[in-house]
Amino acid sequence: MPVVGKIIKIAGPVVVAEGMKGAQMYEVVKVGEEKLTGEIIQLHDDKAVIQVYEETSGIKPGEPVVGTGAPLSVELGPGMLRAMYDGIQRPLTAIEEKTGSIFIPRGVDVPALPRDIKWEFKPVVNEGDYVEEGDIIGTVDETPSIVHKILVPIGVKGKIVEIKEGKFTVEETVAVVETENGERKEITMMQKWPVRKPRPYKEKLPPEIPLITGQRVEDTFFTLAKGGTAAIPGPFGSGKTVTQHQLAKWSDADVVVYIGCGERGNEMTEVIEEFPHLEDIRTGNKLMDRTVLIANTSNMPVAAREASVYTGITIAEYFRDMGYGVLLTADSTSRWAEAMREISGRLEEMPGEEGYPAYLASRLAQFYERAGRVITLGKDNRQGFVCIVGAVSPPGGDFSEPVTSNTLRIVKVFWALDANLARRRHFPAINWLQSYSLYIDDVTEWWNTNTGPDWRQLRDEAMSLLQKEAELQEIVQLVGPDALPDRERVILEVARMLREDFLQQDAFDEVDTYCPPMKQYLMLKIIMTFYQEALKAVERGVEPAKILGVSVKQDIARMKYIPHDEFINVKSKEIMEKIKNELGSLN
């Protein structure tokens, strides 16, 4: 029997109900006559404190609260890709078709996965086979990019006594497993999983392979590993959202889960408009075919922001369990923290720093800890990963505020966006002096093997040049560049080339929007070769003006716009020769 209580207090999204004896923590309840979805977050005697995931205006004390007996869960199965959900996995397009309203009516209940679509199920096991949790029993071609693998649910193992082939809906039985104690378990193509509970795996693997994003500053200087975590903090207008869009478009993950958590609706609209037309460079299909969107914009109820983050990570873990690589981007975790602060205030909890609750750090850590590269459950030892990239919006660009500082304690890659760079039209506006990656040592072997054996050396030299430039800039502003020694004038010029010809990247140019690893390595090698040859010329007594006037500098400036294959196979060698000839002949 479901628990039935009644409302005694309402404070914004927080509702208190009495008569709830027998209810459980984090149980989903239906609140009021309109059956609004809520979740129990505190229990005292027979009173339950509920956070409601919909607008609570108009409900009144005395209305019923009915328990569902289940925690907040998501439906996992075919039909999630290309879909667009709100924070508690309600499909927005299906709601619009059902209600005819462009806004979500209160209390509307539409299943997350379509129940009327029949999917073509192809079995990969036979009757009599022994299966355990996480094994693949069949596949569904969900989109041209992704084959949806149907897994044995967690906690089920035994012998297949029946397996079907053909077209089925997500609720129809496709297999029957007889467990060791003789119980028959029916398996459908859909599973339910509580969002706050991480999905299990066999073993966590070290993050040794870089996630290639095609953005030079992120790949070469501040690498994110597959299964890693990154934060993108930055003030307004510094390019957080465009950076996340670039990651969602070009990173070499199989599936992208994009959570718009408390940000502007226009940004989600941009994703919906752009992604169906853009091509995935690895499969040649549309980007939307590998994307799940969770739209929880700033005008939607506050409590659902927290749910949207957990909904997104659970969907990501499910695709990871199939053996896919998943990139999860959350834009922005600051809005989720603000929602926690608001609800904590309504609960009259003791505030921590800047009014955020004392458990802010542990909640952030729980979320980021669900990233990782793993060996999944199942006999075939598949590997999958979840990368989490969280945008952080510190008010006034202050990186010492609690959300940013707590996030930095947890994540291993920090891409610091700089409003000054954005104003100078330097994009991506990632500040190379503030940013860092703690994965560099782990991924060096991959880069050295797949690009060139001197990759790490080139990267470290380039970084130290940029740091040297920052030190010299103070002197230049006092006395001007002409007062510097010749060697340091060369350093300033090469640092400028690194900034403008390597770090700057045009997201709207069809060639430069994505830069493959080999091209990144060769571009860096060319600039550093110019530096070495220029230093040799300085030692021979050549004036800096002559060195800085060579024509090869124009070729270096144009190299990012040369088509990748042509550059890697032909042009890079030509530019390298030209550098050695032009600078070598100066005397």
From Swiss-Prot:
Disulfide partners: none
Coiled coil: none
Catalytic reaction annotation: ATP + H2O + 4 H(+)(in) = ADP + phosphate + 5 H(+)(out)
EC code: 7.1.2.2
pH-dependent activity: Optimum pH is 6.0 for ATP hydrolysis.
Activity under varying temperature: Optimum temperature is 80 degrees Celsius.
The protein's enzyme class: translocase
Activity regulation behaviour: ATP hydrolysis is inhibited by N',N'-dicyclohexylcarbodiimide.
Claim: Thylakoid is one of the keywords in the record: no
Written domain comment of the UniProt record: Purified ATP synthase is 25.9 nm long. The hydrophilic A1 domain is 9.4 X 11.5 nm, the central stalk is 8.0 X 3.9 nm and the membrane-bound A0 domain is 6.4 X 10.6 nm; the domains are connected by two stalks. ATP is synthesized or hydrolyzed by the A1 domain while ion translocation occurs via the A0 domain.
Cited PANTHER family: H(+)-TRANSPORTING TWO-SECTOR ATPASE, V-TYPE PROTON ATPASE CATALYTIC SUBUNIT A
Family: Belongs to the ATPase alpha/beta chains family.
Name this protein carries in UniProt: A-type ATP synthase subunit A
Native species: Methanocaldococcus jannaschii (strain ATCC 43067 / DSM 2661 / JAL-1 / JCM 10045 / NBRC 100440)
Lineage, uppermost ranks: Archaea, Methanobacteriati, Methanobacteriota, Methanomada group, Methanococci
